[in-house]
UniProtKB/Swiss-Prot annotation:
Example of a GO cellular component annotation carried by this entry: large ribosomal subunit
HAMAP family in UniProt: Ribosomal_bL32
First and last residue of the signal peptide: none
NCBIfam families, per the entry: rpmF_bact (TIGR01031)
Protein name from the UniProt record: Large ribosomal subunit protein bL32
Domain of life: Bacteria
Positions with biased composition (Basic residues): 1-20
């Protein structure tokens, strides 16, 4: 079992954690001009 040789500082741990981010959803413009999420059906036009 792997055991850390020395303690990881708060700063180093925080720097590593900065890469764990939530990506924002990117809505796309539909044919009728409304924005929707990709790969979702449009409720008004019933298009995918």
């Amino acid at each position: 079992m792997a055991v850390p040789k020395r303690r990881v500082s708060k700063t180093r741990a925080a720097k590593r954690r900065t890469h764990y981010k939530v990506s924002l959803p990117m809505p796309i413009k539909d044919k009728d001009g409304s924005y929707k999420m990709p790969h979702r059906a449009n409720p008004t036009t019933k298009e995918y």
